[in-house]
């Protein structure tokens, strides 16, 4: 059976992350001792000063993320991603390497991925993957560890330009780089063990078990609106540095608004409202305009390629 983009509406949904994680420190994944964990818990709500740099401004990663080892989250993401790809392949819903839309996605990713390293030192160790799933869903995601997937529906139904694809991909990659999943898992773990930790500061080996049990939640984990807004900004900068017009975020959200018509897709349920996102993107465009102006532009335009228009 051939790859059929319209034949698989009931495949497992991607994470409800946004159109979507990673610490700038290189802390080992081994067990924390009690005092270090206690200290981390007391300072968990505090954020480091804003990172002074050219481009968008975001706060540092929350220390809550440190309660769950990065390797554990990334391994869980890799396992779930591979399971999803196996299921898609068994359903003949995984695009072959020759598919024009997959080639397009991978070409755009080759421009964005090298720019990820300054945002997260762990990203250079990730085994990045990009795949296309035959499903009419309006969805895309990047799991912890750089595992990217787009659903055919979001490309076809929205008739995305290359810059709009780069905007979505940048947003999803930003969730991974900023460790939003790991942070939310850390907050959940802290809530579950908070009373016992604060009272005893002893014997917290079960934290690892809690994190492992929570690994299965990656597919259903939702990000906060603050996470989504941050991913919009970081994703816009990644796209601009990669040579894609950052103003594409405006046209993208206009398309999303027209498509949703009061019934937003599943992964938009926790997002800021479309008009709010458009205003925020427009307000931040001056911060990335010079980055886009200086960036090398893509030599190939896939959104005007005849082979792509036929698929």
Question: Where are the language model's segments positioned?
Answer:
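A Zn2+-metalloprotease active-site environment signal
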Residues: 2-311
């Amino acid at each position: 059976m051939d790859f059929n983009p319209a034949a698989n509406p009931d495949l497992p949904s991607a994470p409800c992350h946004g159109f979507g994680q990673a610490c700038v420190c290189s802390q080992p994944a081994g067990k924390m001792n009690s005092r270090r964990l206690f200290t981390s818990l007391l300072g968990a709500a505090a954020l480091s000063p804003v990172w002074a740099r050219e481009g968008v401004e975001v706060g540092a990663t929350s220390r809550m993320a440190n309660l769950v080892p990065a390797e554990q989250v990334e391994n869980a993401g890799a396992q779930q991603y591979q399971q999803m790809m196996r299921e898609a392949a068994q359903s003949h819903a995984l695009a072959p390497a020759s598919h024009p839309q997959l080639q397009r996605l991978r070409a755009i990713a080759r421009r964005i991925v090298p720019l990820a390293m300054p945002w997260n030192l762990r990203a250079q160790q990730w085994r990045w993957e990009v795949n296309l799933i035959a499903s009419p869903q309006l969805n895309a995601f990047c799991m912890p560890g750089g595992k990217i997937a787009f659903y055919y529906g979001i490309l076809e139904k929205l008739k995305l330009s290359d810059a709009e694809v780069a905007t979505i991909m940048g947003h999803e990659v930003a969730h991974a780089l900023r460790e939003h999943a790991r942070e939310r898992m850390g907050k959940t773990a802290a809530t579950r063990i908070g009373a016992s930790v604060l009272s005893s500061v002893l014997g917290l080996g079960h934290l690892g078990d809690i994190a492992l049990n929570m690994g299965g939640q990656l597919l259903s984990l939702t990000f906060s609106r603050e996470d989504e807004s941050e991913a919009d900004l970081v994703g816009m900068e990644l796209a601009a540095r990669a040579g894609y017009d950052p103003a594409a975020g405006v046209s993208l959200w206009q398309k999303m608004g027209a498509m949703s018509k009061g019934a937003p897709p599943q992964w938009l349920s926790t997002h800021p409202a479309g008009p709010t996102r458009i205003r925020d993107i427009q307000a931040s465009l001056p911060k990335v305009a010079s980055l886009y102006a200086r960036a090398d532009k893509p030599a190939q335009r896939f959104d005007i390629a005849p082979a792509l228009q036929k698929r």
